[in-house]
Amino acid sequence: MTSKIKCALIGSGNIGTDLLYKLLRSDVLEPVWMVGIDPDSDGLAKAKAAGLKVTADGIDGLLPFVEADEIKIAFDATSAYVHAENSRKLNELGVVMIDLTPAAIGPFCVPPVNLEQLDENINNINMVTCGGQATIPMVAAVSQVQAVEYGEIVATVSSRSVGPGTRQNIDEFTRTTAGAVEQIGGAEKGKAIIVINPAEPPLLMRDTIHCLTKDQPDEQAITASVHKMIEQVQQYVPGYTLKNGPVFDGRKVTIFLEVEGLGDYLPKYAGNLDIMTAAAARTAEMLASKMLNVKTHLNVTKEAALA
């Protein structure tokens, strides 16, 4: 059996707990710690039941054990407001930080677009936002064919899937996502909108992507590029589905998506969680495989987590 890279989860909320389930079935990652601030949180209880060490004393409760437990990678699923300090403390101990907050201290990563181009020596990688992970691949699919003058994304998510951390970071969400639409998606100007839908029963994550190309769009080439990108995202998020499009109207290209989650921690309507945590796990597996010098792929099935 291949040895595994040990990792820690910081944040015991929706995102951290969903990520836990994905890491438990990894071939190259071994979650050994979960950090929270609420001793009664469901996430800490689930982590402890899965055999992880847990602390409710925040990041400072983990630091004394980092070296002894050989933690090499940490995932921060807390808040943009505290991420910088979390990252500084762990980076000083040689831990690579994968940031699931909108803090955007390190370079952005959207796996099918730029994962392979990331510098191996960076110590902080930002996973943009759930809306960014869902929509930026589509902006990139268009911009890889021809120049995109303006890219606008609208991410609609179920209210039940949005925890307190995300609600506190709405402004950071829109700024960070818009920036990544430009930097990673390739649009000259980007805009991001998030809609938190209170409908019951909860709806699946839905995303709309508008791209304004500089020239008349090459409909055949853009359509082929979009379908190819959909397949790449589906390798780690099987519920990522093109519902309509690309629809062409003059220079405007519109794409409609739906994202269904695996139902690891929250129900399947929380595709916004699933695409974020799956992207983070995929990124960490790439880092771990380089540390171990092995080839690997993310196991996306649920059953292995409980085996």
From Swiss-Prot:
Catalytic activity reported: acetaldehyde + NAD(+) + CoA = acetyl-CoA + NADH + H(+)
Protein name listed in UniProt: Acetaldehyde dehydrogenase
Enzyme class: oxidoreductase
UniProt: NAD(+) binding residues: 12-15, 161-169, 272
EC number: 1.2.1.10
Organism phylogeny: Bacteria, Pseudomonadati, Pseudomonadota, Gammaproteobacteria, Alteromonadales
Family per similarity comment: Belongs to the acetaldehyde dehydrogenase family.
GO molecular function: acetaldehyde dehydrogenase (acetylating) activity; NAD binding
Keyword line: Aromatic hydrocarbons catabolism, NAD, Oxidoreductase
UniProt-annotated catalytic positions: 130
An individual GO BP term: catabolic process
